[in-house]
Amino acid sequence: MGILDAIKLGKEKEVAHAKTVRKLSGLEQAIKQRPPPRDFVGAVAERAGNGTVALIAEIKKASPSKGLIRSDFQVAAIAEAYRDGGAACLSVLTDQTFFQGKPADLELAKAVSGLPVLRKDFMIDPYQVHEARAMGADAILLILAMLDHGQAIELEAAAQAMGMGVLIEIHDEPELERAMAMQSRLIGINNRDLATFAADLTTSERLASKVDRNRIVISESGIGGHGDVIRLMEAGINGFLIGEQLLRARHIESATREIAQARLHACP
C-alpha cells in the first residue's frame, strides 16, 4: 500500500467518525455565523498577474517525509511573520495524523494574519469542505492523485458554492489534463514524487509550459530558497507554496521577505 492509499484509508475512517460527532446541519449553522470568505484566488492572481511573487506560506509542524519541522512551533508568531514578510496567502495543515495539525491552527492563523487562508488536508468528502468553511478557511486543496474525476468535480463545486477558492494539485500530465477540465484557475504542481518523497523542480518546469494561459501555476515542494524561486520564475512561474524552507529559518519574516521580493532582472 502506497502512502496516499494509507492516508486515504485513514481519512475515510476519520471523516466517518467526524460525521457521528457533528452533523452536517451543525456545520451549516456554523458557516452561517462566519463572515464571507476572503478572496484567496484573487490575492494570488493580483501578485502573479503583475509579475511579482505570489507566495502561499505554509504553516505545518511536521511532515511524513521530514518529521518534526520546527520545535518552536508558535502558530500566531509564524502567521504574523509570514504576513509581515509579504506572503499573499497562508496554507495551514489541519491533518493531525501525518502533520500534527489541527483546525485551531487555521482559525488562529487567519485571525492574527488578516490574510486569506487555505485548509491543507486530504479532502475526499464534501463534509470536509463544509468543515473547512466552518473553521474559517477561504480555500481548499484538492489532490487529484487521491480523487477520481467525479469526486474532484464534486468537491470543487461544493467549495465554489460556498465562495471558497480551490487549489488543484497535480503531479503529472494525466492529472494536468484533468485539472484543466475543472474550473479553478489555480493549478499546483507538486515537485515531490509520492513514492520516493524525492523532489525535482524540473517537474514544475516541464508541466508549467503545458498549462493554459488563463490558469495560474503554483509550484509546490522542494523549493530551497531564493535561487530556486528565480529558476522557476525563469520558467514562467510566479506562484509558490513554501513551508519547510521558511519554517526552518532562524528569522521567518526575513526568509519570507527574501522569497516574496524575488524579482527577475531584465537583460540590458
UniProtKB/Swiss-Prot annotation:
PROSITE patterns attached to this UniProt entry: IGPS (PS00614)
Swiss-Prot/TrEMBL keywords: Amino-acid biosynthesis, Aromatic amino acid biosynthesis, Decarboxylase, Lyase, Plasmid, Tryptophan biosynthesis
Gene Ontology molecular function, alphabetical: indole-3-glycerol-phosphate synthase activity; phosphoribosylanthranilate isomerase activity
Gene Ontology biological process terms from the UniProt entry: L-tryptophan biosynthetic process
InterPro entries noted in UniProt: Aldolase_TIM, Indole-3-glycerol_P_synth, Indole-3-glycerol_P_synth_dom, Indole-3-GlycerolPSynthase_CS, RibuloseP-bd_barrel
Pathway assignment: Amino-acid biosynthesis; L-tryptophan biosynthesis; L-tryptophan from chorismate: step 4/5
Keyword Amino-acid biosynthesis: yes
EC number(s) recorded for this UniProt protein: 4.1.1.48
Catalyzed reactions per annotation: 1-(2-carboxyphenylamino)-1-deoxy-D-ribulose 5-phosphate + H(+) = (1S,2R)-1-C-(indol-3-yl)glycerol 3-phosphate + CO2 + H2O
Coiled coil start-end: none
Family label: Belongs to the TrpC family.
Protein name as catalogued: Indole-3-glycerol phosphate synthase 2
